[in-house]
Amino acid sequence: IDAFDMKNQILDKRIGTIITQVYNPLIASEVKLRLLEYYNDETEIYYVRAAGIVSEESIRKIPIYELDMQEDIDYLTSIYIPKDMNNKKDFNDLVEIIDTLRGENGCPWDMEQTHESIKNQLLEEAYEVIDSINNDDIDGMIEELGDVLLHVVFHASLGKEDGYFNIYDILESICNKMIYRHPHVFGEGEVNNS
């Protein structure tokens, strides 16, 4: 991954990742902040300088939080993040968990569910989100929004199994809708009020 393109990348912690063009402390700081969205600040990464140049090559392990504090950052600097299966869970993990639960050796209850059988639970979870908002309960919001997201991913898994749609169809649909509804941000339109 090019450090200049970090903001446009979705990192997958389940694979090793090389980030290039980490050539000054400002870029290193931006990369660090992006990595902290996916990894703990103590996660060890490899700081690589002058890879392949025998007399100058340097590779050392550092915690992510120290990335922009390295004194030898220059145009020959890259970093390598090893795969990390024990870190914070992310969206890909949720999709994989649901696929496992509905898979051949999964949970009998999850395997027998249909769009119809779980539709009322989705509505209940949405009401629980509203209750959490009304009670200014941040932890409750995190939990209940997670439950709503679980239902979205579960319905996407059902759609994939039926051959009608998958999670990426849902994501594409909502992204296109948000871009369409905001031409003043993503296009040529102007807006005079909110």
Where are these regions (language model features)?
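Long, charge-dense
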Residues: 1-3
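Short, amphipathic alpha-helical segments
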Residues: 22-29, 165-168, 172, 191-192
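A contiguous loop/helix-start segment that scaffolds small-molecule binding in enzyme catalytic cores
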Residues: 5-88
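Acidic catalytic motifs of isoprenoid enzymes
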Residues: 155-158, 172-194
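Extended low-complexity intrinsically disordered regions
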Residues: 61-141, 191-194
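An amphipathic alpha-helical micro-motif enriched in hydrophobic residues
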Residues: 122-130, 134, 138-164, 168-176
